[in-house]
From Swiss-Prot:
Protein role: Glycosyltransferase required for the biosynthesis of heparan-sulfate and responsible for the alternating addition of beta-1-4-linked glucuronic acid (GlcA) and alpha-1-4-linked N-acetylglucosamine (GlcNAc) units to nascent heparan sulfate chains. Plays a central role in diffusion of morphogens hedgehog (hh), wingless (wg) and Decapentaplegic (dpp) via its role in heparan sulfate proteoglycans (HSPGs) biosynthesis, HSPGs being required for movement of Hh, Dpp and wg morphogens.
Binding locations of Mn(2+): D539
Gene giving rise to this polypeptide: sotv
InterPro entries the UniProt entry points to: Exostosin (IPR004263), Exostosin_GT47 (IPR040911), GT64_dom (IPR015338), Nucleotide-diphossugar_trans (IPR029044)
Organism per entry: Drosophila melanogaster
Matches recorded under SUPFAM superfamilies: Nucleotide-diphospho-sugar transferases (SSF53448)
Residues in compartment: Cytoplasmic: 1-25
Active-site feature positions: D627
Glycosylation sites: N91, N574, N636
Class in the EC hierarchy, top level: transferase
Pathway membership: Protein modification; protein glycosylation; Glycan metabolism; heparan sulfate biosynthesis; Glycan metabolism; heparin biosynthesis
Subcellular location: Endoplasmic reticulum membrane; Golgi apparatus membrane
Entry protein name: Exostosin-2
């Protein structure tokens, strides 16, 4: 208030010494009066802010202390009898029941409620009891990148109430406990883990608790109870699961193993009949007399008791049959032994079905077709079986190996819905990747193309001066060009003097290399200041200004791809059992040649400093395949195909003779086939991706006035 008093004294003194006329006096009084009012308002505002508590979004219930999972100090709370309970909202969708405005900064944050034990004061019953499995789930979230101790910044809320197994808690009391949570708000943005829903006699496929608008991470969904795009299907965990070193390609005696104990009787009868008809290929097991769940005994007397789940490694396929409950722990037990699941459960929503392609690692068969299962399995080739076994092994180690992995996978599935721009592609979710570099995209790509920087044209030339000068003149008029760098790859002859080059308005620089290597075109020269690089041969003079400008605009939208003009395809020849390079026009492409293509300068660094094996040296020695090597490199890291732009397919230099053009040599073509075969062996796989599309301008070939088209001169074939 000191500032206000000083201002008032100043006003008083001003009035005392003022000797102006009445009109000026009135104006001065009004001015001083307004200043006094503003000063008083500011003073009261500052006083209010300094004296009032700064309530957060949850009105003072903020807790910024990191949660400690101390089982010795669990808070005991009484269930609020007046808390409103609402049944599960079966119509919930991602857009209706999830408040995405709580999910800020492009990251998923989960708040975990403190360990609490809700007690009914009338019956003195506890709502739920914490199991070791749920403790592991809480611990996994607590130690993950998703956890936040501040509910104000949380996107999701995870109760510490253990609802994994509906058989061990009172569902009515559990619903009341949920409604008593501080931030429940009808379950909005809350996630509930449940693996064993329902109970006798109905065995519902979803948790029989009043969860209102909460998201269910459930292990027993069918197609009727699952809310697509909202709930997340998770596996039913097995306490008997052990990590054993089963081999995906190991010799397995039986085609099909059946060791599930709770298959419905009508299906067991069918399996008994199949076992009699295929006794050498089907191993049918049941419970032993001592009811030891870690052992299985044959329904016939041909085999001794076997240890479970190790026995599953004896079969190529293992059956998951229909039982009273939809979800069963047998699925993860089967996968732990790298056995291919044969799923004979109609309408079962498989774990993480939204992102995992189960057709690559399982066989689904309708329940009423169980009698034909052996016939269907025999029709699968041995090569396909090995592929599926490897996929099962990879999926298990990636998403199912322990409760921590299951928990974090479920959260990532939900995160991919909330932040789709950061989501992994289906290929990334399902592709076995033996190369560490291809597990992530190294480029930090914005959701929208940034403001154009332009591109640097890097021209590789040797001695074709006339063609080089013509190309420079054509490039200079491209609006998006920033500069030109000429790589003079001839050590026996100096490049023409800069004064003899065409006079252009864009910066032009010349570098003479020390050795004649094709890899020189991909060296990250310091003269390259843009992210976009157009690598172009000195004889590619047929491209128009619009074609080049449009190609750059496409690259801006897909900067992690190779974007260009000449396209090729790789094919497998069954006769020679080798990969073949094909330049004929087909409906598919898998490579874009860097004789005229845009790429990010990051790939120049990778090509120069991190090319696998001896690929770079081999390219320089044979003076061939540098463009194929670049396509392999980018595809291996990103798992993305190149993008061809515009319909042009002919790139022959009109002034060049056939002997001048390297691609006209038949030996050159044979070497390129050998390159593809050699590179695939070095990478240990075929990383090239095949696509059946190209990019053309929106109004391409439309009956539209040329003046209204941005790109008129797209050229011909």
């Amino acid at each position: 208030m000191t500032k206000i008093k000083n201002l008032l004294s100043f006003v008083t003194q001003s009035r005392a010494i003022s000797h102006t006329n009445p009109r000026e006096h009135i104006l001065n009084c009004l001015t001083y009066g307004l200043l006094v009012i503003v000063a008083l308002c500011a003073g009261f505002l500052l006083w209010d802010l300094s004296s009032s508590p700064r309530d957060g979004f949850f009105h003072g219930k903020r807790d910024s202390h990191t949660l400690i999972l101390d089982l010795e100090h669990i808070q005991e709370l009484a269930v609020n009898p007046e808390a409103e309970q609402r049944a599960r909202n079966v119509n919930c969708t991602f857009w209706d029941c999830l408040n995405i405005y709580k999910c800020e900064h492009d990251r998923l944050k989960v708040y975990i409620y403190p360990l609490q034990e809700f007690v009914d004061e009338q019956s003195d019953k506890t709502a739920t009891t914490l199991s070791s499995e749920y403790f592991q789930i809480l611990e996994a979230v607590l130690k993950s990148r998703y956890y936040t101790s501040n509910p104000n910044e949380a996107c999701l809320f995870l109760p510490s109430l253990d609802l994994l197994n509906q058989n061990v808690f009172d569902k009515h009391l559990a619903g009341a406990a949920l409604a008593s949570l501080d931030f429940w708000d009808r379950g909005a943005n809350h996630i509930i883990f449940n693996m064993l829903p329902g109970g006798a006699p109905s065995y519902n496929t979803v948790l029989d608790v009043n969860t209102d608008n909460a998201i269910i991470f459930g292990g027993g969904f069918d197609s009727w109870s699952y809310r697509p795009g909202f709930d997340v299907a998770i596996p039913v965990w097995s306490p008997r699961l052990v990590r054993q070193h089963a081999h995906a390609t190991a010799q397995r005696k039986f085609l099909l193993v059946v060791a599930q104990l709770n298959i419905l009787p009508r299906f067991v009868r069918t399996l008994r009949e199949l076992s009699l008809a295929h006794s050498e290929q089907l191993l049918l097991l049941g419970a032993c007399e001592n009811l030891d769940l870690t052992m299985r005994c044959p329904l016939s007397q041909h085999h001794k008791s076997l240890e479970y789940p190790r026995l599953l490694s004896r079969g190529k396929f293992c059956l998951l049959g229909r039982s009273l409950r939809m979800g069963q722990p047998d699925l993860v037990e089967i996968m732990s032994q790298h056995c291919i699941p044969v799923i004979a459960v109609d309408n079962y929503v498989l774990p993480f079905e939204d992102v995992i392609d189960w057709s690559l690692a399982s066989v689904r068969i309708r329940e009423n077709e169980l009698h034909s299962v052996m016939q269907k399995l025999k029709a699968i080739s041995s090569v396909k079986i090995v592929e599926m076994q490897k996929q099962v092994q990879w999926l298990f180690s990636k998403y199912f190996k322990d409760l921590k992995t299951v928990t974090l996978t479920a959260l990532e599935v939900l995160e991919s819905r909330i932040f789709p721009l950061r989501a992994r592609s289906s290929r990334q979710w399902n592709t076995i990747d033996t190369n560490a570099r291809s597990t992530f995209n190294p480029l930090f790509l914005p959701s929208l193309a940034p403001k154009s920087q332009g591109f640097t044209a890097v021209i590789l030339t040797y001695d074709r001066v006339e063609s080089l000068f013509l190309l420079i003149q054509k490039l200079a008029v491209v609006p998006s060009l920033q500069s030109i760098l000429v790589i003079w790859n001839n050590q026996k002859k100096s490049p023409p003097h800069l004064s003899t080059f065409p006079s252009i308005s864009k910066p032009l620089k010349i570098r003479q290399t020390k050795e004649n290597k094709l890899s020189n075109r991909f060296y990250p020269y310091p003269e390259i200041e843009t992210e976009a690089i157009l690598t172009i041969d000195d004889d590619i003079i047929m491209l128009t200004t619009d074609e080049l400008d449009f190609g750059y605009e496409v690259w801006r939208e897909f900067p992690d791809h190779i974007v260009g003009f000449p396209s090729r395809i790789h094919v497998w020849e069954n006769v020679t059992m080798r990969w073949h390079y094909e330049s004929e026009w087909t409906n598919q492409i898998s490579m874009v040649l860097t004789g005229a293509a845009f790429h990010h300068k990051y790939w120049s660094h990778m090509y120069t400093h991190a090319m696998p094996g001896d690929i770079k040296d081999w390219v320089d020695e044979h003076m061939n395949c540098e463009d194929i090597a670049m396509n392999f490199l980018v595809a291996n890291i990103t798992n993305n195909p190149p993008i061809k732009v515009t319909p042009r397919k002919k790139f022959k230099c009109p002034e060049c003779t056939n002997t001048e053009m390297l691609s006209a040599d038949l030996n050159h073509m044979r070497e390129r086939s050998a390159c593809i075969d050699r590179f695939s062996k070095i990478y240990g796989r075929m990383p090239l991706r095949t696509v059946e599309f190209r990019a053309d301008p929106v109004l391409f070939r439309d009956n539209f006035p040329d003046k209204l088209k941005r790109y008129n001169d797209i050229g011909s074939l």
